[in-house]
Regions:
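Hydrolase active-site cap/lid region
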Residues: 166-214
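Gly/Ala-rich beta-loop-alpha elbow adjacent to hydrolase catalytic centers
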Residues: 153, 157, 161
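A glycine/proline-hinged amphipathic helix-loop "lid/cap" segment
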Residues: 1-65, 298-299
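Short amphipathic alpha-helix adjacent to the substrate-entry channel of hydrolases
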Residues: 91-110
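Short beta-strand element of the alpha/beta-hydrolase
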Residues: 73-83
């Protein structure tokens, strides 16, 4: 495995983060993830950024809206952050989503769904579905075009995004960035990269335990019939244990006659799209996603 200099710089930064003073393992992992924010680069200015809280009957969900200009009825991408279902926030993905809004020219709405293990499956997925439905029903208030909508997410967020796409009918496309699509962790890439970098087999088993409350097979977020899924863009990384399951999912979608665009980034690692401040390919991937979104949504 050839580690490129910029990837090594990112790994060095990650290895320098110290959270040993936090005794609670779960909290330490969450704080650790927040401390990786600088890898995304500087915080770009966006025309408007607004935080809102959606009040459902039984819970509140926060969203962050990135608006690239003051035009009305812009297309929209609803984004679900990664973090293994148990960490991540509006802040961990703020910088890449600012970049995506500026490069794509569409509204990006980031969803702060509830996290496992406090809220195991299906709470997080239901939050994502319900929030997307709320966005659709409040399109005029939000200044978006609900008929030009995509969902997107990275890692566990990609899992949630495709779960939403399978439940709702008016999603034009989905962008899945190294999505976790198989809880068995049995593909060759899990053997090849069991010790990482970034994501290990042990960590993956733990996150699926968190997400499912120990009932791993219960967390089926995918329909058996994929024929109704929207056009799909999947990004994978060569040195990523999730690589093969994402590629298998792409193949299943194609067999269901879904249009799939797929890019494998050579010598990249899990999470590289969040590391665009250090790794050039991370920023390039965001630009490529922006181009895809514009092509699919901007009429």
């Amino acid at each position: 495995m050839e580690i490129l200099p910029q990837v090594q710089d990112a790994l060095n930064f990650i290895h320098s983060v110290n959270v040993t003073h936090i005794e609670d393992k779960l909290q330490a992992s969450r704080v650790f993830y927040e401390k990786l924010i600088p890898l995304a680069g500087t915080q770009e200015a966006v025309f408007a950024v607004e935080d809102k809280t959606i009040e459902f009957t039984d819970r509140k969900i926060s969203i962050r809206i990135y608006r690239p200009d003051n035009k009305k009825k812009l297309p929209v991408v609803v984004y679900f952050h990664g973090g293994g279902f148990f960490k991540g926030s509006l802040e961990t993905h703020d910088r890449p989503l600012r970049q995506l809004a500026n490069l794509s020219g569409v509204v990006i709405i980031s969803v702060d769904y509830r996290l496992a293990p406090e809220y195991p499956f299906p709470h997080g997925l239901n939050d994502c579905i319900d929030t997307t439905e709320w966005i659709i029903s409040h399109a005029e208030e939000l200044g978006i075009d609900s008929h030009c909508m995509a969902v997107a997410g990275d890692s566990a967020g990609g899992t949630l995004a495709t779960g939403v796409a399978g439940k709702l009918n008016n999603i034009l496309c989905q962008v899945l960035i190294y999505p976790a699509t198989e809880s068995s962790l049995a593909t060759p890439s899990w053997s090849e990269f069991a010790e990482g970098p970034i994501l290990t087999l042990k960590q993956a088993n733990e996150l699926w335990e968190y997400y499912t409350g120990g009932k791993i097979n219960a967390a089926s977020t995918f329909n058996d019939d994929l024929s109704g899924m929207p056009d799909t863009f999947i990004i994978t990384a060569e040195y990523d244990p999730v690589r093969d399951e994402a590629m298998v999912y792409a193949k299943k979608l194609r067999h269901a006659n879904v249009e799939v665009t797929e890019i494998l980034y050579p010598k990249m690692i899990h999470g590289f799209v969040q590391m665009g401040g250090v790794i050039d390919q991370g920023r390039e991937a965001i630009a490529t996603i922006a181009e895809y979104v514009r092509y699919k949504l901007v009429k």
